[in-house]
């Protein structure tokens, strides 16, 4: 462990956690042992002195784009997906607080009875007080992914880097689960991600990150302690930058 925060390159980070990461090997919902492991990884990073914000997806409960494909109005489907992210955020908050991690959930869709509305200044203040802020509700707008929300919130919070936790250990030129010969990139430019149509994030999210010079690091959440390792430039990952 690094006890001196000044020795760390990244002092304020945003972690993007997909809904799928929260369900483990299940087909739907939550796997609490997996969530507890993720919470433990987050605590390890907090103990380094790093300020942490989180954006959660909702794909383990509902995927708006899939519902739209079978005939549901896309905007309505996306709003339902945003509600799914709030469920995930509250679940993650509960598990994190069981580990004595001070946590606040801020939703882009106001739900005063269950969490705070997203206000940028309030979110920044929570982070300054070393609370973990979990952003829910996506951007609050339909037709926008939670990846776009992650990029926007990282920029708004002045984060040093966005870390995307996935099921694989980086960005590949094709799906490594389907193609055993898939080539892994250790670093790749925003332009090449867009040009090669790599499905690590949607094009809009990558474009906004590029415009604001926000580096993105993609790593596997499956291995215990990976979050802390990646923060310290260790382990397996891919960095997306200019």
From Swiss-Prot:
Positions annotated to bind UMP: 58, 78, 139-146
Chief localisation class: cytoplasm
Keyword Chaperone included in the entry's annotation: no
One protein family per Pfam: AA_kinase
GO biological process per UniProt: 'de novo' CTP biosynthetic process; UDP biosynthetic process
Statement: the UniProt record of this protein carries the keyword Repeat: no
Name the record gives this protein: Uridylate kinase
Gene responsible for this protein: pyrH
